Amino acid sequence: IPLTLDSGNNDHSIESAEERSLTLELVTQSLEISNSSTAKESTQPNPIDGINLIRVDGVLPCPMLSADAPAILLPKRLGFQSVLSHPLGISPWADPSDPLAPLALDRLGDGPLLLQLFVRGNPFQANRSIREPWTDAIQQLIDLNRLFGLVVYGSPYVWEALSALLPSSIPAAYSPGQMPDAQQQLLQRLLNPDPSPALSRLGINEFTD
């Protein structure tokens, strides 16, 4: 079912309770979750101390990813430090043409890596896959036992291609929508973070100059 929600507006003050309920129902029904139990079992009092690598098309503007977006704050509850990858920033790639080690992991830091991709259309056309070889990157992370989980927002083509690479031990999820509601519903099911700690808006890094 196509969603016609405004991804740039997370203010629900003009929605009635019935409209709000319908919105969340549509979002929830559109989600696809795989192997979420692994992530839930990983929830623990001690921070995971991992990397939340978020890929977006751009940040000027980026309405679906404000400083308080669920894609940033919910992983933060588990101890993930967010890092943004976007066209105007420094590339996270060491050598995109190297199928064994395309990601520059020395720039990202140590620990498990949660990969969230905000993509639209089919980036496997028009040589986009050469510039952003996420298939090879995921295999690189799997081989190093560093891939904590995969989330794809938007493109079903990317989800289909990347989720097929994952072993059953790695949690993954897909949402056709990219709005904050979709992030919230998806990550709550995938990560099951402890809702009790107060959230901070700090702790966001970017690949920028």
Residue ranges of predicted features:
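Preference for extracellular/luminal or secreted protein segments
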Residues: 1-209
